[in-house]
Amino acid sequence: MSNIHDMEFLQKKVQELKEQGLYKELVTLEGPSDAECVINGKKVINLSSNNYLGFANHPRLKKAAIEAIEKYGAGAGAVRPIIGNMKIHDDLEKLLAEFKREEAVLAFQSGFNCNAGVIQALTDKGDLIISDQLNHASIIDGTRLSKADKAVFQHSDMADLERVLKEKRNNYNNVLIITDGVFSMDGDIAKLPEIVALAEKYNCLTYVDDAHSSGVLGESGRGTVDHFKLHGRVDVAMGTLSKAIGVVGGYVAGKKVTIDWLKNRGRPFLFSTGLPPAAVGAAIEAVKMLMESTEYTDKLWANAKHFKEGLGKLGYNIGHSETPITPIIIGDEAKTLEFSKKLFENGLFSGPIVFPTVPKGTGRVRCMVTAGHTTEQLDRAVKICEKVGKEMGII
């Protein structure tokens, strides 16, 4: 009889992943996340981070983080509802509310925590959550935690969304329609104006996850709501401090009454220690930089256009991305892993995305262009993609 502490059941599952070509090893950065970085001792062009604006290693953010530590210490010391709420937290939320053009904001420890806590706090038994088929895992898990009933509509299919509304709306108290602003695997933008129109037609609430559009879409990166000029018509806008902002954390923006409720019933907010001062100080500086100039967002979009054009000329399948997210769709899982491995060997890191993150048969390397990349680096990346693609018979 085997020893239960040997975790034999997990050993079998890990072995199955390896046999299926789905097992992934963690790579280790030996320095900051930047346009070029050192991974496992090798210097490579980094096309895998969510550091859209190049802020993660920006001198202004590092200086602000150090100053915040010197003033407030290394940690908050408690959950914010007890004695972990520092003035720097309030300053961040006030600035974010101004930036997002919303009444109020509440910051969470991560974007995942934000969705997991907010969705369940806003819905209850007798309510219905309607979610896009390709919404992020944090939305799926937040929905599971809710007592509300759930329904899913086909990805960005407004006819299917209206079908669900016609069938179900009258059976529930409140209905919450949730969508990603930008879908992280394909880079397409939600049809937010159409979603809002249907929500208003059927008297529903709307919730947009702006994780991949904060700092990317809208004026100076204000997000999807600003991109479509839907201020006052989207009830909840979630954002992250971990991607374009370059630090860590998440936040939700909306009406003051919504934020007041979440301060009392948002479980991750209630039961997790507040964000550390260094992260908050750096995030404040990043938002200030966005409010000062469009320099970084302009560079991001120019770089994305340049890189997409280069891949397009090679004949790669880059899907229907409308944002800097640029998938190179390979298909077969094992071939995707091999493609990513060969890119790395040639000086380019773009991590493989395979099942269960994306459906089987749609494996891809997801290239994340940033404002921090130079034209020379992007041209070099395209040449590496050309070399590997031809060697493997992909192009």
From Swiss-Prot:
Substrate binds at residues 24, 136, 357. This is 8-amino-7-oxononanoate synthase. Keywords: Acyltransferase, Biotin biosynthesis, Pyridoxal phosphate, Transferase. NCBIfam families: bioF, gly_Cac_T_rel, PRK06939.1. The lineage of its organism: Bacteria, Pseudomonadati, Spirochaetota, Spirochaetia, Spirochaetales. GO terms for molecular function: 8-amino-7-oxononanoate synthase activity; glycine C-acetyltransferase activity; pyridoxal phosphate binding. Catalyzes the decarboxylative condensation of pimeloyl-[acyl-carrier protein] and L-alanine to produce 8-amino-7-oxononanoate (AON), [acyl-carrier protein], and carbon dioxide. One of its GO terms (biological process) is biotin biosynthetic process. InterPro entries: Aminotrans_II_pyridoxalP_BS, Aminotransferase_I/II_large, AON_synthase_class-II, AONS_Archaea/Firmicutes, AONS_Archaea/Proteobacteria, PyrdxlP-dep_Trfase, PyrdxlP-dep_Trfase_major, PyrdxlP-dep_Trfase_small. Pyridoxal 5'-phosphate binds at residues 111-112, 184, 209-212, 240-243. Belongs to the class-II pyridoxal-phosphate-dependent aminotransferase family. BioF subfamily. The keyword Acyltransferase applies. Its EC number is 2.3.1.47. Homodimer. Its cofactor is pyridoxal 5'-phosphate. PANTHER family: CLASS II AMINOTRANSFERASE/8-AMINO-7-OXONONANOATE SYNTHASE, LD36009P. The keyword Cytoplasm does not apply. It comes from the Bacteria. Pathway: Cofactor biosynthesis; biotin biosynthesis. The modification N6-(pyridoxal phosphate)lysine is found at residue 243. CDD domains: KBL_like. It catalyses: 6-carboxyhexanoyl-[ACP] + L-alanine + H(+) = (8S)-8-amino-7-oxononanoate + holo-[ACP] + CO2.
